[in-house]
């Protein structure tokens, strides 16, 4: 499983693995429960390689954020998203100290940590963006 095959679908919880293309969109499999569904072509779908986080300098790809989280947690999951915004911001501030505190909202941090935990729970250990 590579990061380029992992999708975030607007309005749907969790992350999805790309399975195949269908007439009306994509067939995807949930990383949460393993169920397959059809994601219509009109849905807002993003691969995780297309997403980046705001920092004080250059924006950094989500893959780099996940790599830093993985190194910091030593291969374990990060804090639970139920621990509250203060704990998640503290964790994120240690992992990405120069993130833009004005443009990165609490919900963005919560989603990034949630996705990281989901990927680690699914056995993903390398968060690299493949060369084109």
Residue positions per predicted region:
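Conserved phosphate/pyrophosphate-binding and hydrolysis machinery centered on Walker-type P-loop NTPases
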Residues: 56-59, 78-85, 102-109
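The feature represents the first ordered module of a protein
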Residues: 1-80
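Eukaryotic low-complexity, mixed-charge intrinsically disordered interaction/regulatory segments enriched
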Residues: 71-76, 83-86, 94-98
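C-terminal charged interaction modules
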Residues: 87-132
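General N-terminal targeting signals
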Residues: 35, 43-45, 70, 83, ...
